[in-house]
Amino acid sequence: MAKHPVPKKKTSKSKRDMRRSHHALVAPNLTECPQCHSKKLQHHICPSCGYYNGRQVLAV
């Protein structure tokens, strides 16, 4: 049977945590829709009213 490669040295908690430092989740940046005042993603059509950039783009 073939042997699988294994780490030669134990990874310290510091090295492990430094590697994981970029793994945090980022909360979506929600803004208020100027038309209906519901929460929406920036640079996206409002899912409640269908407005984007001051004009209706989607019939809701």
Curated annotation (Swiss-Prot):
GO terms for molecular function: structural constituent of ribosome. The keyword Ribosomal protein applies. Keywords: Ribonucleoprotein, Ribosomal protein. Belongs to the bacterial ribosomal protein bL32 family. It comes from the Bacteria. Residues 1-26 are annotated as: Disordered. Gene3D superfamilies: Single helix bin. This is Large ribosomal subunit protein bL32. Transmembrane segments: none annotated. Signal peptide: none annotated. InterPro entries: Ribosomal_bL32, Ribosomal_bL32_bact, Ribosomal_zn-bd. Residues 1-23 have a biased composition (Basic residues). One of its GO terms (biological process) is translation. It comes from Deinococcus geothermalis (strain DSM 11300 / CIP 105573 / AG-3a). GO terms for cellular component: large ribosomal subunit.
